[in-house]
Amino acid sequence: MLRKLVTVIALATTPAWAAQASAPFTGADYSGRYECTGQDKHIGSYKGVVDMALDAKQSTGKYAAYTFTLTLEDKSRYDGMAAGTSDALGVYFAHTDPVLKDFGVGVAQMTSTPEGKVSFVKYYYTPEYEGGGHGLEHCVKS
């Protein structure tokens, strides 16, 4: 009897939002390939390419979810994910070699170049890599 009562109470108090389907994605889609230059505390200047793809199943309303890969000129690769809205993304990334402990978080501000190309500036923080570090990356959609 007590079990039935608890079940009824649990079902009756389930929030209405829990049963609703996700709203379709209506935000900006920043998917694509970006040419990047950066300045890192440890490696100095670098160049690379970011390939970013919208995860449509996890994007809803104005909120976007992405997966991405940054490949540097020396073929080092970082896999990551981002989530955001409008013109700002929160970012997580990690080098494909976990032994390096080269992973971090960042914030990316989406904008347009004077020529009208989509671009972003990303500030990032790497807490473990060689005692910690940070960097700034400028990327333009190609």
Regions found by a protein language model. Name each.
Residues 20-142:
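Central antiparallel beta-sheet cores of small beta-barrel/beta-sandwich binding domains
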Residues 1-6:
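Bacterial N-terminal signal peptides that target proteins for export
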Residues 10-19:
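Hydrophobic h-region of N-terminal signal peptides that target proteins for export
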